């Protein structure tokens, strides 16, 4: 029994080290919850943050080079949702792929908390207004991550299911180097959530869904 537990632990640790969960041979579960989940868009960069005091959480999700077969806007920053591509989210749930792309010729910097970017998923509520269905927890451990020209980060995002059918998108709050704050929105897509996801925040417990997510 101890050997089995040790083997499972080794597999879990190897997945975490890669920074991106691999598909499990078992069918992926649907994510049907009744609360706002904490943000999970963690990113790393090869450029060190010389302004941070240290002690912040790190990530293994490093940038990738834009390839010729990728259809991405040139000359701008873009947040791209790819709902038609299923990926593993939090090791056992069906998710979708999201790209944050630097199509400019400049190195871009992004504020983060424990390497968590300011990205959340939003949905149109019953009143027809865009509202977040995820939230960013408070943290004193701020840091910067950098994205070089023609690079992008790839994320596995939550694909929610629920009784309320709606439109969804992702929103990035980006503070440029001149301290000007901008909102960057992804393309919209069809999906569903539960009504409580607009108001009830996930409890900060050791058994939360995000404890199974790879940074």
Where are these regions (language model features)?
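Sec-dependent N-terminal signal peptides
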Residues: 4-13
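Boundary at the C-terminal end of the N-terminal hydrophobic targeting segment
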Residues: 17-21
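Low-complexity, acidic Ser/Thr/Pro/Gly-rich terminal tails and inter-domain linkers that flank the onset
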Residues: 22-95, 103
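Terminal connector regions
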Residues: 26-28, 35-53, 59, 156-215
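Short structured motifs
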Residues: 82-85, 138-142, 155-156
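Intrinsic-disorder/low-complexity, polar/charged segments enriched in Ser/Thr/Lys/Arg/Asp/Glu/Gln
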Residues: 93-97, 152-154
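The feature marks short-to-medium sequence segments in extracytoplasmic or secretory-pathway proteins
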Residues: 105-147
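Short Pro-Gly-centered flexible turn/kink motifs
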Residues: 146-157
